[in-house]
Each structure stands twice: as structure tokens, then as C-alpha cells.
């Protein structure tokens, strides 16, 4: 059996920008993407803690060390600058791999810098 499992998440990131007229996606600081093992164009789920919105999009790299979390395209209607979000990536695993897999959880501070690593 194959299972959809949480691979990683960036927990309680703060939206720094929203660009309604961009084609789509979420721009994430490259450092955070690497720590969370999220590749460019990888599908991610975004959960908005402020308003309960949930949506799927794909990740694109932001400037390394910038703390950028920018919601692009139509999803910009679901988040505002300053909103707290969780960004989750998933992987498909067989039962044995899923039982032993430890997801990466990246906690960030108010500037989207990793903490408690």
C-alpha cells in the first residue's frame, strides 16, 4: 500500500508579500526551502492560521536569507501580509518507509528565520 505522508513543514511562517498579478505559486526563502527539503516547483499545501483558508500551490525560490514568504496569483486573495501560515510538503511512501520516516519540521521566528534547529 502507498500512503500520502507529511514530508516536511515550515511552521508559523509570516506572509511578507502577496502578488495577485503573478502567475501563481508561493515564493519561499531558499534557505527555508532547503531546510524543509522542498524543491522548486514542488506541490505544497498552505494553511492560513488567521482565517482558516487552505490551498495547494507550488513553491518557487526566494532570495536566500531574505525571510520572503510571498503568496502569488489567485491565492493572494486567501492571505494577507502579516498572516501566519504553515507550509506542508508531502511524499508517497510504502508502509515500511512511512512507519520509520521522520518529517522535517522547521520552526521560524517573526522574521521567518529558522529557530530551534
UniProtKB/Swiss-Prot annotation:
Tell me the cofactors it needs.
pyruvate
UniProt subcellular location: Cytoplasm
- Does Lyase count among this protein's keywords? yes
Post-translational modification, briefly? Answer: Is synthesized initially as an inactive proenzyme, which is activated by self-cleavage at a specific serine bond to produce a beta-subunit with a hydroxyl group at its C-terminus and an alpha-subunit with a pyruvoyl group at its N-terminus.
Source organism superkingdom: Bacteria
**Active site (catalytic residues):** 25, 58
Where substrate binds, per the record, is at 57, 73-75
Q: Which CDD domains does its entry note?
A: Asp_decarbox
* Catalytic class of the enzyme: lyase
In this UniProt entry, the residues modified to Pyruvic acid (Ser) are 25
Give an example GO biological process.
alanine biosynthetic process
Checking SUPFAM superfamilies in the record gives:
ADC-like
| Cofactor: binding details | Binds 1 pyruvoyl group covalently per subunit.
> Which family does the similarity line name?
Belongs to the PanD family.
Q: How does it assemble?
A: Heterooctamer of four alpha and four beta subunits.
The name under which this protein is listed is Aspartate 1-decarboxylase
